[in-house]
């Protein structure tokens, strides 16, 4: 079973992987991740490269390069233990492969290392990971419409994701959140999103830090009666997010989505709302209102 499970998951993901490979971002990222392998193993690229092998073969890895690659494999396996989606697995592989490539190229020749770093910087500046464009029942807010919508009908419960397009965690969570909206959206339970990377005043108003150091993105907030009831991740006294895994199971359990969904389909009754959560610290496919995915 230990072998069959990954194979089944791989076969199940083949259609999605094939769509990824057709996109320039993933093609170029895969090429950069395999750059050292191509340079070291493919003639005539490998001819004339320095090597520490006893046989002097420049087209094969020396012992130090093998050690670095083995260390890379161990790091990727440890990081992927906490990954939830295929996107997170692939993203970890690409990120740590590029770090290993930079080390290997600098070890080979400082000029090759500088060239590789330059290519990576150009790639980061010119290529952005594709946004999730699948089916969803999510309303996208801007800095003006979010307050209006929360106050418009206080009988409606809202779950709002505060995200930024540059955040890898937000991109990985996008298909999970979309799937939840398809399963649980109803008249009394709605799902929304707001880009706090674009609307910084919203991030300040709802106390969601966009700094990568705080790890507060994405943030999910449950609103009932127009007021915040709970959020994940919670914030500690230093303003940093308490570690929390954004999996579908965790969101359903923590936000009581099954109960909220059943309650939202019935006429509202007094005392139906979830009691407001005590904070850890005092730290502070429907698109409307002119917002759409391509605008973000």
UniProtKB/Swiss-Prot annotation:
GO CC annotation: endoplasmic reticulum membrane; mitochondria-associated endoplasmic reticulum membrane contact site; mitochondrial membrane
Topological category with respect to the lipid bilayer: Single-pass type I membrane protein
Transmembrane segments: 103-125
Domain annotation Thioredoxin: ranges: 114-270
Spans within the Extracellular topological domain: 49-102
Cytoplasmic side: 126-296
Extent of motif Di-lysine motif: 293-296
Assembly information from the UniProt record: Monomer. Homodimer; disulfide-linked. Occurs in both reduced and oxidized monomeric form. Oxidative conditions increase homodimerization. Interacts with CANX. Interacts with ATP2A2.
Protein name per the record: Thioredoxin-related transmembrane protein 2
């Amino acid at each position: 079973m230990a072998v069959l499970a990954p194979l089944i998951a791989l076969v199940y993901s083949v259609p999605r992987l094939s769509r990824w490979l057709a996109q320039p971002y993933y093609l170029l990222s895969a090429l950069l991740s395999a750059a050292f392998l191509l340079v070291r193993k493919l003639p005539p690229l490998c001819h004339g490269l320095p090597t520490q092998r006893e046989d002097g073969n420049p087209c094969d890895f020396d012992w130090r390069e093998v050690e670095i690659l083995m260390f890379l494999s161990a790091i990727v396996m440890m990081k992927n233990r906490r990954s939830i989606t295929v996107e997170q697995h692939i993203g970890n592989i690409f990120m740590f492969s590029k770090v290993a490539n930079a080390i290997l190229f600098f070890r080979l020749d400082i000029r090759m290392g500088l060239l590789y770093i330059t290519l990576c910087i150009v790639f980061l500046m010119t290529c952005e990971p594709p946004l999730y464009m699948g089916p969803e029942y999510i309303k996208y807010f801007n800095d003006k419409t979010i307050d209006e919508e929360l106050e418009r009908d206080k009988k409606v419960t809202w779950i709002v994701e505060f995200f930024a397009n540059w955040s890898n965690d937000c991109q990985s969570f996008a298909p999970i959140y979309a799937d939840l909206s398809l399963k649980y959206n109803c008249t009394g339970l709605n799902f929304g999103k707001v880009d706090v990377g674009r609307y910084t005043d919203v991030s300040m108003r709802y106390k969601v830090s966009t700094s990568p150091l705080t790890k507060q993105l994405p943030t999910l907030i449950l609103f009932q009666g127009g007021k915040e009831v709970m959020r994940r991740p919670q914030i500690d006294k230093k303003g940093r997010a308490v570690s929390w895994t954004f999996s579908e199971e965790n969101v359903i359990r923590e936000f009581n989505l099954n109960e909220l969904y059943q309650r939202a389909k019935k006429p509202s009754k007094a005392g139906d709302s979830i009691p407001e959560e005590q904070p850890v610290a005092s730290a502070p496919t429907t698109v409307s209102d002119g917002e759409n995915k391509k605008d973000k």
